[in-house]
Amino acid sequence: MELVLVFLCSLLAPMVLASTAEKEKEMDPFHYDYQTLRIGGLVFAVVLFSVGILLILSRRCKCSFNQKPRAPGDEEAQVENLITANATEPQKAEN
């Protein structure tokens, strides 16, 4: 019985090798399916966009401390104050 099984398997081995060789010839490594790649990229972008919108609308990302509302030009004034404060400080001498 084992001999018959080995014989049948030995007959199937060349068939399997021949079919894999044909598949390798058919499969061109430089042939890309751009349509599927484009659709996959668009689906990925839509999912990320939707997750971003849901995060913004859910308001789960909150600061742990209360901030008072600032005027639109307040950030620029704060940066200018820091620049002038750093410019007027005396340089510390290092030993």
Curated annotation (Swiss-Prot):
Keywords, comma-separated and alphabetical: Cell membrane, Ion transport, Membrane, Potassium, Potassium transport, Signal, Sodium, Sodium transport, Sodium/potassium transport, Transmembrane, Transmembrane helix, Transport
Subcellular location: Cell membrane
Alphabetized PROSITE patterns for the sequence: FXYD
Domain of life from the UniProt record: Eukaryota
Record keyword Magnesium present: no
Cytoplasmic-facing ranges: 59-95
Extracellular side: 19-35
Single GO molecular function: sodium channel regulator activity
Secretion signal, residue range per the UniProt entry: 1-18
One Pfam short name: ATP1G1_PLM_MAT8
Cross-referenced InterPro entries: FXYD_motif, Ion-transport_regulator_FXYD
Membrane topology: Single-pass type I membrane protein
Any one GO BP annotation for this protein: sodium ion transport
Record flagged with keyword Secreted: no
GO CC terms: plasma membrane
Transmembrane segments: 36-58
Family assignment from sequence similarity: Belongs to the FXYD family.
Function: Associates with and regulates the activity of the sodium/potassium-transporting ATPase (NKA) which catalyzes the hydrolysis of ATP coupled with the exchange of Na(+) and K(+) ions across the plasma membrane. Reduces the apparent affinity for intracellular Na(+) with no change in the apparent affinity for extracellular K(+). In addition to modulating NKA kinetics, may also function as a regulator of NKA localization to the plasma membrane.
Subunit structure: Regulatory subunit of the sodium/potassium-transporting ATPase which is composed of a catalytic alpha subunit, a non-catalytic beta subunit and an additional regulatory subunit. The regulatory subunit, a member of the FXYD protein family, modulates the enzymatic activity in a tissue- and isoform-specific way by changing affinities of the Na+/K+-ATPase toward Na(+), K(+) or ATP.
Name of protein: FXYD domain-containing ion transport regulator 6
Gene designation: FXYD6
